[in-house]
Curated annotation (Swiss-Prot):
Compartments, record wording: Endoplasmic reticulum membrane
Official protein name in the record: Cytochrome B5 isoform D
Alphabetized Gene3D superfamilies for the sequence: Cytochrome b5-like heme/steroid binding domain (3.10.120.10)
Gene name for this UniProt entry: CYTB5-D
The entry's keywords: Electron transport, Endoplasmic reticulum, Heme, Iron, Membrane, Metal-binding, Transmembrane, Transmembrane helix, Transport
Functional note: Membrane bound hemoprotein which function as an electron carrier for several membrane bound oxygenases, including fatty acid desaturases.
């Protein structure tokens, strides 16, 4: 089913999302895979869930063979208007990680210092009280 290079919007492609009329978008190209649904090894439901969106990631995640990729040419009907496909949000790491990490390290240091000093002070106080009470024996 060779296409003539027509350009479709994502809205137009989304209208073809049933088992009787199924179009998908992979790598910026539109494919009418209706006739292939029954032959798909993973079943038709796998393809039907990828309609109405850019299915490139779904297609690549499965790890299709080069034969499967070559089969797509049979079903090509045109290209997608990339302006109509939503841009995927990219992860942007926080910029002020050093300030947070430094603050965490300083508070960790204070906690560890207190965990060491408080028992030491309690022990010192206990020995001091014991020593004081022994040396100050009651005078009779």
């Amino acid at each position: 089913m060779g296409g003539d290079g027509k350009v479709f919007t994502l809205s137009e492609v989304s209208q073809h999302s049933s088992a009787k009329d199924c179009w998908i978008v992979i790598d910026g190209k539109v494919y009418d895979v209706t006739k292939f649904l029954d032959d798909h090894p993973g079943g038709d439901e796998v393809i039907l869930t990828s309609t109405g969106k850019d299915a490139t990631d779904d297609f690549e995640d499965v790890g299709h063979s080069s034969t499967a990729k070559a089969m797509l040419d049979e079903y090509y009907v045109g290209d997608i208007d990339t302006a109509t496909v939503p841009v995927k949000a990219k992860f942007v790491p926080p910029t002020s990680t050093k300030a947070v990490a430094t603050q965490d390290k300083s508070s960790d240091f204070v906690i560890k210092l207190l965990q060491f000093l408080v028992p030491l002070l309690i022990l010192g106080l206990a020995f001091g009280i014991r020593y004081y009470t022994k040396t100050k024996a009651p005078s009779s």
